[in-house]
């Protein structure tokens, strides 16, 4: 039973390994994708049309929506709001560049904003939208050239919203107007697609809105985050579908409500249909290492002389939970806390409350650590009392080992008898700590996923809580604090176990060298509080005699 601390140590190492592996999955290098399946000879090259009389059937015309190359040198409309700088291509009427003005690329480049949507060869991430018709002309991002009254729009100080209309009209009397609506202090962009039918025949079809994306090149460790599609449907409210999945099998679902998004670390772009009825969600590999993920709202029929419209919302911005939740139900799940969301969300709420109180995310983490320590105070007290009693028994345990030598059975029996006599539970110090592990894991994911901590300073040399400590001071302090904790705990009687336990601070220091400073800060503060509590309880036990 004296091996309990070695078991606990092994459990903690396993937890760290699993966290490291999970980090590599979502924040490590992106793996090479399998080659996409080749089309068979019978599949043909042309795009099939939308089934005219079967609106509930899968709309197969989306299969080749992205075969046209992205046009370069096209005429551009530039839009600037208080939060966004946007470029819209007139050749398709779609957004091909979105810059987030309040989010610099790095602390070293404070005047260079993050570019979420872009077309930087070979990396591509753009929106595409249009109309696919079963009866009448299709107006797609591949086939039309829009016009606009101006080429530059800016949301001025006394305006709360800004409209950017783009129009296209054919010789037969079909007129399409795409209107983008921007709001002050918002990353949501509303898109209204209006169809005016000036012909003598009904127009029937669907709108589509999608993302076209190439997987970013693989970077070094911690250089890349998970990049991929996410769908929310009635069947599954949050479903990741990465590029590897789409390379091997296309995605299609029908659902009322829902949304489709492309996510990456800290930022998200999402299409949200606003029409009533059943939406069709899809994703697939197309060509030139490009992937699409999108949605088609329900089909509409527009009689001659009438007009109709499709409405969608586009969110392009940081993963700020309350803003995401206001755009669409469950969109806040793109802030992915993993399987322990039920614990991570209240922890984030409490940390945010502390930030509003003190105005610094680093001090908010410190205060959050105090609260977590207070919640587990009684459990920790039980653990440290058990350790203190074990420490008092240490000389007698060593005497038993000397008396019985290599007879492990007799040593074990004698130790158990001593534990019963002194009313000491050798596992009493283990269970309370194990119970706290889920909370630590929830804190881990909460600190990693919170865009609010991105480039947030603490004090002195810590200028970004989401980056590693540039001078490794916090990891070293953590190692020292763990070493001090060990000195307050009973040493293992087995020499091999003693050597393994002695390596524990070194191993944890190495593990945490590359972890974000905010997470290491939590661990350091937690260790310091644990040392104070353990020292106080140990002194009490020793004074009791």
Curated annotation (Swiss-Prot):
It is a multi-pass membrane protein. Residues 34-59 are annotated as: Disordered. It comes from the Bacteria. Signal peptide: none annotated. InterPro entries: Membr_insert_YidC (IPR019998), Membr_insert_YidC_N (IPR028053), YidC/ALB3/OXA1/COX18 (IPR001708), YidC/Oxa/ALB_C (IPR028055), YidC_ALB_C (IPR047196), YidC_periplasmic_sf (IPR038221). GO terms for cellular component: plasma membrane. One of its GO terms (molecular function) is membrane insertase activity. GO terms for biological process: protein insertion into membrane; protein transport. Keywords: Cell inner membrane, Cell membrane, Chaperone, Membrane, Protein transport, Transmembrane, Transmembrane helix, Transport. It is found in: Cell inner membrane. The chain crosses the membrane at residues 6-26, 357-377, 428-448, 505-525. It holds the Pfam family 60KD_IMP. Interacts with the Sec translocase complex via SecD. Specifically interacts with transmembrane segments of nascent integral membrane proteins during membrane integration. Required for the insertion and/or proper folding and/or complex formation of integral membrane proteins into the membrane. Involved in integration of membrane proteins that insert both dependently and independently of the Sec translocase complex, as well as at least some lipoproteins. Aids folding of multispanning membrane proteins. Belongs to the OXA1/ALB3/YidC family. Type 1 subfamily. This is Membrane protein insertase YidC. It comes from Nitrosococcus oceani (strain ATCC 19707 / BCRC 17464 / JCM 30415 / NCIMB 11848 / C-107). The gene is yidC.
């Amino acid at each position: 039973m004296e091996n309990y601390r070695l078991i606990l140590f092994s459990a903690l190492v396993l937890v760290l390994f699993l966290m490291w592996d999970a980090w590599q999955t979502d924040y490590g290098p992106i793996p090479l994708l399998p080659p996409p399946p080749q089309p068979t000879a019978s599949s043909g090259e042309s795009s099939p049309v939308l089934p005219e009389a079967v609106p509930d059937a899968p709309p197969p015309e989306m299969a080749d929506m992205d075969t046209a190359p992205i046009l370069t040198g096209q005429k551009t409309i530039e839009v600037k709001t208080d939060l966004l700088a946007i470029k819209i291509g007139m050749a398709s009427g779609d957004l091909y560049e979105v810059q987030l003005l309040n989010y610099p690329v790095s602390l070293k480049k404070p005047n260079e904003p993050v570019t979420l949507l872009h077309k930087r060869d070979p990396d591509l991430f753009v929106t595409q939208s249009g109309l696919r018709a079963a009866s009448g002309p299709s107006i797609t991002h591949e086939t039309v050239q829009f016009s606009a009254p101006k080429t530059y729009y800016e949301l001025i100080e006394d305006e709360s919203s800004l409209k950017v209309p783009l129009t296209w009209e054919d010789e037969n009397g079909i007129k399409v107007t795409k209107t983008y609506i921007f709001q002050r202090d918002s990353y949501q962009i509303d898109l209204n697609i209006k169809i005016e039918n000036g012909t003598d025949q009904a127009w029937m079809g669907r709108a589509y809105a999608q993302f076209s994306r190439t997987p970013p090149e693989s970077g070094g460790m911690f250089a890349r985050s998970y990049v991929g599609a996410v769908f929310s449907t009635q069947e599954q409210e949050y479903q990741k579908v990465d590029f590897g999945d789409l390379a091997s099998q296309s995605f299609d679902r029908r659902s009322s409500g829902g949304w489709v998004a492309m996510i990456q670390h800290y930022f998200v772009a999402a299409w949200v249909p606003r029409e009533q009825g059943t939406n069709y969600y899809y994703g697939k590999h197309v060509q030139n290492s490009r992937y699409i993920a999108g949605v088609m709202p329900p089909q509409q029929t527009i009689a001659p002389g009438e007009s109709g419209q499709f409405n969608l919302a586009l969110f392009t911005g940081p993963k700020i939970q309350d803003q995401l939740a206001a755009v669409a139900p469950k969109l806040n799940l793109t802030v992915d806390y993993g399987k322990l969301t039920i614990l991570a969300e209240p922890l984030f709420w409490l940390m945010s409350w502390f930030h509003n109180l003190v105005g610094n995310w680093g001090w908010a983490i410190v205060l959050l650590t105090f609260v977590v320590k207070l919640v587990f105070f009684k459990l920790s007290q039980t653990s440290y009392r058990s350790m203190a009693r074990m420490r008092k028994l240490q000389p007698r345990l060593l005497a038993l080992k000397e008396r019985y030598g290599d007879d492990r059975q007799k040593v074990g029996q004698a130790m158990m008898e001593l534990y019963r006599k002194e009313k000491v539970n050798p596992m009493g110090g283990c269970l309370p700590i194990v119970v706290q592990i889920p909370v630590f894991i929830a804190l881990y994911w909460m600190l990693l996923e919170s865009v609010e901590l991105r480039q947030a300073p603490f004090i002195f040399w810590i200028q970004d809580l989401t980056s590693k400590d540039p001078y490794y001071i916090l990891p070293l302090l953590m190692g020292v604090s763990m070493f001090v904790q060990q000195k307050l705990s009973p040493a293992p009687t087995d020499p091999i176990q003693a050597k393994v336990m002695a390596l524990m601070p070194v191993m944890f220091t190495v593990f945490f060298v590359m972890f974000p400073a905010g997470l290491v800060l939590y661990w350091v503060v937690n260790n310091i509080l644990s040392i104070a509590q353990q020292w106080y309880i140990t002194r009490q036990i020793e004074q009791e005699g």
